[in-house]
Amino acid sequence: KGGFQQFAARHGLAVVCPDTSPRGSSYPGEHDDYDFGSGAGFYLNATRAPWNETYRMFEYVRDELPRLVQEQFPVDTNRAGIFGHSMGGHGALMMGLRYPERFRSISAFAPISSPSNVPWGKKAFTGYLGEEERSWEEYDANRLVQAGHRCAHEILIDQGSADPFLHEQLQPWVFESSCREAGQPLKSRMQDGYDHSYYFISTMMQDHFQHHADILTGEV
């Protein structure tokens, strides 16, 4: 839908797309909202019941999925990057900053880059982790940068100026400020007139694949 296939083929990159949440469970309220439960697992390990039974997407992306890919496909998992959109962008930034030796390149489209500060993130973190905000910090890209986590290469972020979630839910300037203060290289581009949709993603997709290819093939 985002039109990545041609760019993946051009650069010789395999693309692995994990789901937003685990499947097969049926907890009360799990399927009610697009921004929680089966619509948005936020790539963390839940600690609150009942979510802690299966909502362990952090471990899945960190451990199980890379191992499965390595076993089943002829790819070099030592040269891996990570990227995503919106909540997936949150996951990409968070995972990439926590495990820079595993994910050498990072990019995101309209990410939730400071989830502890916005309604989407507060709802998810409270629901999955509880109200103690200290437990949120390890899953918040903005807090991770402030705590000293780094990506050795420049992070690329694209954000649409007409995104309806820009001011309430995304607030990229918060993450930008933390990166400046911490010395984390970041290219954050505000794209005039674009919204939160796949048209925005497909327009910028080529640049993101070039970003990852340059780093993963040793050209940067």
Residue ranges and their predicted role:
Residues 1-220:
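Non-catalytic cap/lid and distal C-terminal segments of serine-dependent acyl enzymes
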